[in-house]
């Protein structure tokens, strides 16, 4: 089974059994190739048309999916490395933003791309956020190799691997 199909099967199971975790570490082969899969996972969590009888994976018809596709969904924050690092100030800013309630009365999601680029200071800052999650917040951390992420972060996340091979 190819990795994309396997990934969609995993996220479909998460939805079907209503087992949404507060934090995911998604291990990818290629950020660019796998990014749409990550956005589809976000849509599955947030889509206004998603219910137990109807799955939404990239429906493209509702406001939420359209806003996610255009990068304008207010309760989705994407953190990218600043140069070669994810810095403490980025994590502090994220925490401040997510201390407020959702503007849309829905889940709030943050994605940390290349989370293996967190230094010890930024990892410690986000760790407390992962240890004491708000009910309406979901973290999605993306790494090309989970073994490059600090153990305390890994231990607080559900791991989903899209890699073509396991180490």
Where would I find each of the regions flagged by the language model?
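P-loop/Walker A NTP-binding region and its immediately flanking N-terminal helices
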Residues: 1-114, 138-140, 151
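Conserved adenine-binding aromatic site and its adjacent loop/helix in ATP-hydrolyzing domains
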Residues: 96, 128, 155
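A short beta-strand-to-loop transition that corresponds to the Sensor-1 phosphate-sensing loop
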Residues: 114, 141-146, 163-166
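A short helix-turn-beta junction within AAA+ P-loop NTPase domains corresponding to the substrate/partner-engaging
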Residues: 151-164
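Sensor-1/coupling segment of RecA-like P-loop NTPase cores
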Residues: 118, 133-153
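ATP/adenylate-binding site constellation spanning eukaryotic-like Ser/Thr protein kinases
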Residues: 73, 91, 123, 146, ...
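Catalytic acidic motif of RecA-like/P-loop NTPases
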Residues: 113-119, 124-127, 131, 146-147
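Conserved catalytic/switch belt of AAA+ P-loop NTPases
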Residues: 99, 124-141
């Amino acid at each position: 089974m190819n990795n994309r199909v396997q990934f969609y099967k995993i996220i479909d199971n998460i939805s079907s059994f209503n087992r949404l975790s507060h934090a995911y570490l998604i291990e990818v082969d290629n950020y660019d190739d796998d990014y749409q899969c990550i956005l589809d996972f976000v849509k599955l969590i947030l889509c206004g048309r998603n219910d137990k009888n109807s799955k939404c994976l990239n429906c493209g018809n509702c406001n939420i999916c359209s806003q996610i596709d255009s990068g304008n969904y207010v309760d989705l924050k994407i953190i990218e490395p600043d140069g070669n690092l994810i810095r403490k100030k980025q994590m502090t800013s994220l925490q401040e933003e997510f201390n407020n309630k959702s503007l849309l009365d829905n889940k709030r999601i943050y994605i940390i791309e290349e989370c293996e680029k967190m230094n010890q200071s930024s990892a410690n800052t986000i760790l407390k956020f992962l240890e004491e999650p708000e009910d309406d917040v979901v973290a999605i951390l993306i790494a090309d190799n989970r073994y490059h992420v600090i153990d305390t972060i890994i231990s607080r996340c559900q791991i989903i691997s899209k890699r073509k091979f396991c180490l």
